[in-house]
């Protein structure tokens, strides 16, 4: 089984690490928009494989969703955090665009993918993906 995690920040990297450590799948693909970020996180996580006792392959990519092709499950953690003074509506407006774009790219390469949404505000983003 293949799992994609979109967003290689603290939440996404932790999610990818947990999935790998529990041997839920044979491959995890980390995707991020920051150049080289997902690749670096993937290398860091792979270097812990022998210590943590997993053999799940972890790779990273900068926005190349073709690498996610054939994913069975995808976890969307991407989006901006709510900043001081920012309204919920402003957060929804920004993160909705991000989540829509991510979802379209995931479904394009893995039409049967099951999507789990962790981006805030979670209730609205999950409804948007549905």
Language model feature labels by segment:
Residues 19:
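Aromatic pocket-lining residues of Rossmann-like dinucleotide-binding sites
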Residues 33-71:
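Conserved N-terminal Rossmann-fold NAD(P) cofactor-binding segment
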Residues 88-130:
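Rossmann-like NAD(P)(H) cofactor-binding subdomain of soluble oxidoreductases
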Residues 12-13:
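N-terminal Rossmann-fold NAD(P) dinucleotide-binding loop
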Residues 1-3:
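Extreme N-terminal starter segment of soluble prokaryotic enzymes
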Residues 78-80:
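Conserved NAD(P)H cofactor-binding loop of Rossmann-fold oxidoreductase domains
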Residues 8-9:
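Glycine-rich Rossmann-fold phosphate-binding loop(s) that bind the pyrophosphate
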């Amino acid at each position: 089984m293949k799992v994609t995690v979109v967003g290689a920040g603290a939440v996404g990297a932790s999610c990818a690490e947990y999935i790998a450590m529990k041997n839920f799948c044979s491959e995890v693909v980390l995707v991020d928009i920051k150049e080289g970020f997902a690749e670096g996180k993937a290398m860091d996580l792979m270097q812990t494989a022998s210590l943590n006792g997993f053999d799940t392959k972890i790779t990273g990519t900068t926005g190349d969703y073709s690498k996610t092709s054939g994913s069975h499950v995808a976890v969307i953690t991407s989006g901006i955090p709510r900043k001081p003074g920012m309204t919920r509506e402003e957060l929804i407006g920004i993160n909705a665009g991000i989540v829509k774009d991510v979802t379209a790219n995931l479904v394009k390469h893995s039409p049967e993918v099951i999507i789990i949404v962790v981006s805030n505000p979670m209730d609205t983003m999950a409804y948007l993906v549905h």
